[in-house]
């Protein structure tokens, strides 16, 4: 019987840690392939264990600023919808005041890890994509509950150097060596293929790299922008 893995992504940390991927592969046109991201690290765990791993759930935790004057949330809303509809993620998004977003993410992520750990047969291995030492108490509890832990970190996240080294060794919260995001940069990079799609509005076919669930041709997008500026 395969081991069940559940992935927990600290969206705030992952956004900041893109700098490590930029440094590895260049900033221009770099995008993360969110559909591949959890699978890449579950496959790595499977290779370490030399047994099958079943990815049962990917949880993404993020925020939307509620107190920033004039801030348009439509782009973030569309991104979170994309994670759910196209990548199969479960998202937990909080409206927060600017400056307190990370605390909400940390509390929600830790609570969710422990909640599912308490459900019989929900998962065997927790894969944490994030590396703040604030997670150490929750990760220790997971191990006491018989769960195994894999930490996915970055060597530089904009604030700290190698924080996960301290997290996994000093606090003894991981069962596996830390996996480094920058070492898997090429694997998690989104490579867009050009395909022909039909416009949802007019039915016209056009070549595009857009992979979202709905596609609108350049003419329809242009007319929409024109009306929006009128």
Q: What kind of feature is each model-predicted range?
A:
Residues 1-103, 144:
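Domain-level signal for Mg2+-assisted phosphodiester chemistry and nucleotide/NA-binding surfaces
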């Amino acid at each position: 019987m395969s081991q069940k893995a559940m992935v927990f992504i600290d969206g705030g940390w992952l956004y900041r840690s893109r700098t490590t991927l930029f440094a590895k592969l260049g900033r221009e046109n770099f995008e993360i392939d969110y559909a591949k991201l959890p699978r890449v690290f579950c496959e790595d765990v499977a290779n370490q264990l030399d047994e099958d791993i079943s990815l049962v759930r990917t949880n993404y935790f993020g925020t939307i600023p509620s107190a920033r004057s004039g801030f348009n949330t439509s782009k973030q809303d569309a991104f979170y919808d994309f994670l759910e509809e196209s990548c199969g993620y479960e998202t937990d998004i909080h409206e927060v005041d600017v400056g307190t977003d990370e605390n909400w993410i940390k509390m929600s992520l830790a609570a969710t890890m422990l909640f599912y750990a308490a459900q019989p047969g929900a998962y065997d291995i927790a894969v944490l994509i994030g590396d703040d030492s604030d997670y150490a108490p929750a990760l220790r509890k997971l191990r006491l509950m018989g769960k195994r832990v894999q930490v996915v970190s970055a060597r530089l996240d904009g604030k700290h150097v190698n924080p996960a080294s301290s997290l996994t060794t000093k606090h003894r919260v991981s069962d596996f060596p830390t996996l480094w995001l920058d070492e898997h940069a090429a694997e998690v990079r989104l490579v867009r293929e050009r395909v022909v799609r039909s416009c949802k509005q007019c039915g016209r076919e056009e070549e595009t790299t857009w992979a979202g669930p709905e596609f609108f041709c350049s003419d329809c997008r242009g007319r929409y922008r024109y009306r929006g500026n009128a």
